[in-house]
């Protein structure tokens, strides 16, 4: 259905049991009524009477409860269990060499079978990782082959579909302390390996599980971030750039990445860059420089909320998992809470009412926080395409030209490829 409708490949699917519908789900039904529901102070609901949808103020205090986020970052174990990885080629599973475990190419799709123990019982997880540049046939085949593998194992495994850039913490932890490496595109299939670019930039960041992920990003200085470590490779030299707020885990992850890439690098602490370093990135540029201590980041991780009134009521829903640029809906207003500041991001197609409600809700959100937030916490408004480095820095692998192509065209292009 997602493919046929031309929706983005990363569209999330949520399964709801009967009588377990969420408020967000119910908003899309004009005449939804729960069993024994009443209007007002006990007035019985009349089935043939449909009330007019009114703009009801949203209770922002409920946003401070975050069970979805806790579930998203759950760890069944420490990632040291047995694993098998296959790459999808010609609609078949092809085993990946163990020496290449942990390396994922954006032009491929993979199936990862993981075995774990819980409460003395054996369990399995099937991760289906789908690259941004993977073809429609590969994506379809990965889903079918994952279902077949599940059947072969008796239907017991947990199946997890993973879109590039939305890797859960447990998946990142599976590679023996080495970083999970995600190449921007290309493929690793036999006889069809993509030639590496002359200049490459990798961003190394720690996940909530304490393991690192190395993501290839555009090789521009604006993608640097004081909170992370970076690896920059060129034909003449390579560099390990250490941000002031980066951790030892990230620094060590960058060193492991250098070993895998087969290059040696000069270590450059932030603030001690050479002209050659800046030259390889096309010159200096603004980037996120306000280093934030990692313990503070762990205590107050960034949270993203989508604001919409498309159903006739203004609602706000938290985006689960690690945030990515894909989560910013151009027809909505988004709230990004970085603790020290709350950003109101305005999509180009957002409605005027959404903008007004979102700004007001940002202030109410701060005031109602049970953690006793400083009421003076600044609220910044930024528009799509004009995001400052202080906003961009929270998103891993930000692409400056992401919205140059219409989302529907991008989705259709992915399907036709």
Curated annotation (Swiss-Prot):
Protein name, as recorded: Gelsolin
Gene Ontology terms for molecular function: actin filament binding; metal ion binding; phosphatidylinositol-4,5-bisphosphate binding
Purpose: Calcium-regulated, actin-modulating protein that binds to the plus (or barbed) ends of actin monomers or filaments, preventing monomer exchange (end-blocking or capping). It can promote the assembly of monomers into filaments (nucleation) as well as sever filaments already formed. Plays a role in ciliogenesis.
Residues annotated as binding Ca(2+) 6: 150, 155, 157
Pfam family, one: Gelsolin
Domain topic, free-text comment: Comprises six structurally related gelsolin-like (G1-G6) domains, that, in a calcium-free environment, are packed together to form a compact globular structure in which the putative actin-binding sequences are not sufficiently exposed to enable binding to occur. Binding calcium may release the connections that join the N- and C-terminal halves of gelsolin, enabling each half to bind actin relatively independently. G1 and G4 bind two Ca(2+) in a type I and in a type II manner. G2, G3, G5 and G6 bind only one Ca(2+) in a type II manner.
Major place of residence: cytoplasm
Residues binding Ca(2+) 5, per UniProt: 107-108, 138, 187
Segments annotated as Gelsolin-like repeats: 93-171, 213-261, 316-392
InterPro entries assigned: ADF-H/Gelsolin-like_dom_sf (IPR029006), Gelsolin-like_dom (IPR007123), Villin/Gelsolin (IPR007122)
Binding site for Ca(2+) 7: 227-228, 250
GO terms, biological process: actin filament severing; actin polymerization or depolymerization; barbed-end actin filament capping; cell projection assembly; central nervous system development; cilium assembly
């Amino acid at each position: 259905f997602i493919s046929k409708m031309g929706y983005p490949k990363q569209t999330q699917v949520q399964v709801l049991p009967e009588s377990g519908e969420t408020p967000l789900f119910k908003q899309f039904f004009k005449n939804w009524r729960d069993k024994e529901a009443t209007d007002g102070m006990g007035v019985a609901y009349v089935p043939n009477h449909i009330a007019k949808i009114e703009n009801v103020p949203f209770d922002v205090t409920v946003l401070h409860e975050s069970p979805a986020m806790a579930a998203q970052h759950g760890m069944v174990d420490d990632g040291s269990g047995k694993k098998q990885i296959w790459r999808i080629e010609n609609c078949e599973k092809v085993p990946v060499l163990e020496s290449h475990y942990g390396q994922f190419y954006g032009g491929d799709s993979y199936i990862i079978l993981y075995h774990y123990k819980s409460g003395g019982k054996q369990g399995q997880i099937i991760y289906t990782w789908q690259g941004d540049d993977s073809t429609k046939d590969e994506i379809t085949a990965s889903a079918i082959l994952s279902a077949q593998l599940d059947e072969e194992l008796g239907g017991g495994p947990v199946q997890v579909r993973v879109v590039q850039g939305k890797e859960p913490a447990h998946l990142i932890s599976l590679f023996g302390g080495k970083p999970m490496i995600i190449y921007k595109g290309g493929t690793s299939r036999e006889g069809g390996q993509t030639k590496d670019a002359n200049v490459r930039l990798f961003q190394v960041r720690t996940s909530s599980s304490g393991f690192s992920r190395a993501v290839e990003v555009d090789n521009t200085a604006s993608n640097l971030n004081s909170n992370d470590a970076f690896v920059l490779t060129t034909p003449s030299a390579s560099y390990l750039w250490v941000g002031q707020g980066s951790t030892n885990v990230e620094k060590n992850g960058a060193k492991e990445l250098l070993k895998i890439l087969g290059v040696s690098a000069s270590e450059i602490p932030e603030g001690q860059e050479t002209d050659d370093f800046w030259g390889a990135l096309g010159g200096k540029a603004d980037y996120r420089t306000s280093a934030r201590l990692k313990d503070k980041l762990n205590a107050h991780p960034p949270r993203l909320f989508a604001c919409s009134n498309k159903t006739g009521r203004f609602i706000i829903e938290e985006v689960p998992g690690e945030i990515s640029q894909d989560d910013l809906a151009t027809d909505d207003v988004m709230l990004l809470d970085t603790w020290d500041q709350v950003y109101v991001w305005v999509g180009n197609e957002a409605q005027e009412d959404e903008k007004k409600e979102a700004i007001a809700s940002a202030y109410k959100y701060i005031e109602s926080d049970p953690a006793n937030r400083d009421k003076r916490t600044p609220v910044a408004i930024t528009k799509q395409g004009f995001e400052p480095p202080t906003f961009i820095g929270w998103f891993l692998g930000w692409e400056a030209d992401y919205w140059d192509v219409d989302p529907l065209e991008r989705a259709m292009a992915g399907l036709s490829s």
